[in-house]
A protein has these predicted regions:
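N-terminal signal-anchor module of multipass membrane proteins
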Residues: 1-110, 356
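C-terminal ends of transmembrane helices
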Residues: 41-57, 101-114, 150-165, 212-223, ...
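Membrane-interface helix-loop-helix junctions at boundaries between adjacent transmembrane segments
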Residues: 108-201
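Internal active-site segments that recognize and position negatively charged phosphoryl groups
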Residues: 175, 183-241
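Internal/C-terminal transmembrane anchor helices
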Residues: 334-359
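Short helix-capping/linker turns of helical repeat alpha-solenoids
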Residues: 375-378, 388-389, 394-397, 403, ...
């Protein structure tokens, strides 16, 4: 029996020799290191079995829900991958995690008893985790640790429910909560792709339609429609109230971000860790909507990673599952669930048709945010800055210059000279003459000194910006020493692990 986890460990080590993996020594080392730990686990289980004269058994238990979830995840990753190359680059990472989870789960079961059960379950667990959080290659060993924590929680943290022992926490959401909390507390968010994941999911063409359509399969099979309906309806009501009070939109340019809509459809709809009754599931969804909305406002206010809003509340809701079932009502299934599926579809059609959901939200208008900023509405200036930055990176180069002016002046927003210099350089490099004309003045009027001070304090981004502004013909008049100083600053940025700087130097 132990040949199976040993073979999985061998498969994991083999993945380290793929060109895309081998090109990153820390990533390859994490694959090999985890394969070695699994092999050691095999030896440990074998020794424990001999000491206790045990016969290990394995049962393959295919669960319909798991292979349906797997199919949904494949479709979702495919749509996402067609709009962001990062998904294709991450495929070896996902395969490695699946091999690791299968092996770790088997070894954990055999360490604790004679029989292990397996099926398709590890695939959607890994898929769900990777819809929200990836670690950078330099820290990818933490991704395996995250999965191990989830497996341990599923195996060890139980309660009595409906006459049987079952796990309390969703094996995806619990480790996501734990790791996100630690990352935030230690100011280590830079170690992950969490923000890029949240942003790029909203760039999928027809993202909300795809998420809704795939979510229908989950809702129909698991009878979790009321969870999703409750969450989305609550977020809609809170958005309306927010706009009524502040005159602006909470999530800037969309009613519910795609990443949060994904959470409403897939993260909190695990039937094993959510309430079983119709009233309980509706309340569960309402509480999720309230928690996500409140967490977003709070994280934004304290300067935390607002993209963790959908992840930090789920384990606490899992703990309420049995209490919420005491609200009474019939089980959430059968024809009643199909009725709620139809009602949810009608509600989605209304929200999508009114542009509350989807890519055509009224908050897409830069003029709206400029006027709101001039009127000093709540968070309007920071939202305007965010919108300008997004438009800049979508190829509207004039918006880069506007963003630079906004952050250089420091009138409506806190002055941020590294950001201003970056956007001036980007606009100038793309041929915007007016931005090029501003650079010399920006450097002479305190920009160079501010960037140099930040660079000397080991801010790699400032080193890169200053080096970029000094390089080439961006900063007139000519300076014979400028090229050498520019290269030195960019080299320092590369030393400080700014990948764009290393790319600039060809390293």
């Amino acid at each position: 029996m132990l040949l199976l986890p040993l073979g999985l460990a061998a498969g994991l080590s083999t993945l380290s020799f793929l060109p895309s993996v081998a090109a990153s020594p820390p990533l390859a080392a994490s694959f090999l290191g985890m394969a070695g730990l699994l092999a050691a686990g095999v030896l440990g289980v074998a020794a424990r079995g001999r000491d206790r004269a045990r016969t290990l058994r394995l049962r393959f238990v295919p669960v319909t829900a798991h292979w349906v979830q797997t199919g949904v995840h494949v479709a979702l990753y495919t749509a996402w991958g067609l709009s962001w190359d990062g998904v294709a680059d991450h495929v070896p990472h996902i395969l490695a995690q699946i091999l690791f989870y299968y092996a770790f789960d088997l070894l954990l079961a055999w360490w604790r008893g004679d029989e292990a059960r397996t099926g398709f379950g590890p695939i959607p667990i890994v898929g769900s985790v990777n819809l929200f959080l990836w670690f950078h290659d330099d820290f990818f060993w933490l991704q395996f640790l995250l999965l191990a924590v989830g497996a341990l929680a599923k195996e060890l943290v139980h309660w009595q429910r409906d006459g049987r022992r079952t796990h309390i926490f969703n094996p995806s959401s619990f480790p996501l909560f734990l790791f996100c909390a630690v990352l935030w507390a230690t100011n280590s968010d830079h170690m992950t792709w969490a923000q890029q994941i949240a942003v790029t999911q909203g760039l999928i063409p027809h993202a909300w339609l795809i998420l809704f359509a795939l979510g229908l399969a989950v809702q129909a099979l698991f009878s979790t429609t009321l969870v999703t309906v409750g969450a989305v309806a609550t977020l809609y009501a809170l958005n309306l109230a927010y706009t009524q009070v502040t005159g602006v939109y909470c999530w800037v340019d969309v009613g519910i971000p795609a990443a949060i809509f994904l959470g409403c459809n897939f993260l909190v709809t695990d039937p094993s860790t959510s309430p079983r009754t119709a009233r309980g599931r509706a309340a569960f969804g309402v509480l999720y909507g309230l928690a996500v909305f409140g967490l977003y406002l709070w994280l934004r206010e304290v300067g935390g990673p607002a993209y963790y809003d959908k992840l930090l509340c789920v384990p606490f809701l899992n703990l309420l599952a049995q209490r919420l079932d005491r609200l009474g009502g019939s089980p959430a299934g059968g024809r009643a669930n199909l009725g709620w599926v139809a009602a949810g579809a009608a509600g989605f059609a209304i929200l999508y048709g009114s542009n509350f959901l989807g890519p055509n939200h009224a908050g897409k208008s830069l003029d709206f945010w400029e006027r709101a900023c001039e009127e000093d509405r709540w968070y309007a200036c920071s939202s305007w800055s965010e919108s300008l930055d997004f438009a800049c990176h979508e190829g509207e180069w004039q918006r880069c210059e506007e963003h630079a002016v906004l952050t250089e002046e420091g009138v409506r927003l806190e002055r941020d000279l590294p950001e201003a210099g970056y956007h001036y350089a980007l606009a100038c490099q793309e041929g915007l003459a007016t931005a090029c004309d501003r650079i010399s003045g920006f450097l002479a009027e305190g920009g160079a000194d501010a960037l140099a001070a930040e660079c000397d304090a080991d801010d790699g981004f400032s080193c890169l910006v200053l080096g970029t502004l000094w390089s080439g013909d961006l900063a007139a008049p000519p300076d014979p020493d400028r090229s050498a100083r520019a290269t030195a600053r960019i080299e320092r940025a590369c030393e400080l692990d700014v990948p764009e700087a290393c790319d600039f130097l060809g390293r």
